[in-house]
Amino acid sequence: MNKKLYIELISLIILGMITSLSLPPVNYLMVNFFTFTLFFLFLIKKSNQHKNKKLFFFYGWLFGLGYFFTNLYWISISLTFDQNFKFLIPLTVFLIPAFLAIFYGLISFFFIILKPKKIVSSFLVFSLIFGIIEFVRGSILTGFPWNLIVYSFSNQLEFLSVTSIIGTYGFNLFCISLFSSPAIFILKDTKKNLGVCVFFFITIIFFYIYGSFYKEKFNNSVRETYDYKIRIVGSNISLDRFYLNVDPISVIKDLIKISNPIKKEKTIFVWPEGILPNISQGELIEYEWLFEKNFSQNHFLIIGINDESINNGTIDYFNSLSVYDNKLNLLDSYNKINLVPFGEFLPFKNILKLVGLKSITNNYQSFSKGKQRDIIDINYKNFYLKILPLICYEIIYSGKLFKNNNFDLIVNISEDGWFGQSIGPKQHFAHSILRAIESGKYIARSTNNGIAAIINPLGSVEQAVNFGKSGYIDFKERRQIQPTIFSKYGNKIFGLLILLYIFLIFSFNRIKNE
């Protein structure tokens, strides 16, 4: 390998690493114009120099390796809590980014196969392939749509408002085009090329204007006040509760203290995911005395707790969100359907168990997948609330959360302590912002060792218990908003954008002297 090629390959990794700076919590958005433009220019340059298409897979893979290595390193922190898993840390630090980088390798590989001769058409093909592959990454197998480049805008809410129409994948496709568009100016053959570049910059300005009007319309909408409070608890209880046989009573008392229940006030309390150690749904009744002492008939609790059921002589475990009254009568429950690979279940269990692998949580027992996600209707004792339950990283899936948008509120419970003081919990939180905008619904997020918050349909955080803190926030009023276009049609809109790009590619390809 000659020195020049070696430098080029290292540069691709560095470009991917720099691109990570655009993601939460750093959000240096402007670096994407530099990195995406250089990556596209590199592929164009190499396409004119040699015809070895297999090399192009390697180019994209290196860019993806640098990108995912720097923004997903925190996954390995989840292996530090148990001595049995520490030997896997060096493997996960490299293997997870290396696997996800395969998708970026496919981007550059398919690009060189399908690349037209004309610059603008090539640019559109690059953007389209990138956008489609990112959709595939978020859908195939269990799907992992983490750190799409659209999250660079996670603190620019006016721009993000357009996701209420075109969704996350639609805006992600646009972002790829926007960040790569300076390459058209650099490679321009005619003024028409420059016009395409200008078009994307004008469009992003239009998105900002739309977002500003959308914000004003929302802020002028009618407020609706509940006659009860929804109290969202954010706790900071150590994960040692799972490993040191911590008495569940002490954890329950801590949560009650944070919740600060007042018996005369009508309140729905929301506690984080899996917060009670070594207690299943059926065992919680043993602590009825503690709940009945501190809560009244004016109270309901939404608790993240594991459930068990016997199926053909074996025990199935579920990660559940359950609704109780103050006497711990179970009113409704949801079992998580999108499980975390290796964290909550072991893929290819029969094979991987032979080499000593097991799931990290639930005392090494894999969770089972719930049947479906139904809206939970709390209609008891003059409480009227319909919630969409989401547990932990189920919040990351765009366009797959609900078929019926007839609910009042998204309740998302999570345990972010597995990722320590890293950027992981902050990236996790950023997904909630886009889901709120897409759905046009408020999100009530209760988290242990993370960020608990009320997020409105603009994606704005109205109240929060910050990272590393304990406390609660009360949600009592909301603004009414019309159902979003995306909530009606979902990712079908992304499909329409794909067809639009294909039409433009063929149109520009027909134009002589592009």
Predicted regions and their residues:
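Membrane-embedded alpha-helical bundles of multi-pass enzymes
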Residues: 2-218, 421-422, 432-435, 447-452, ...
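Soluble catalytic domains of enzymes that build or remodel membrane lipids, polysaccharides, and related
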Residues: 213, 217-489
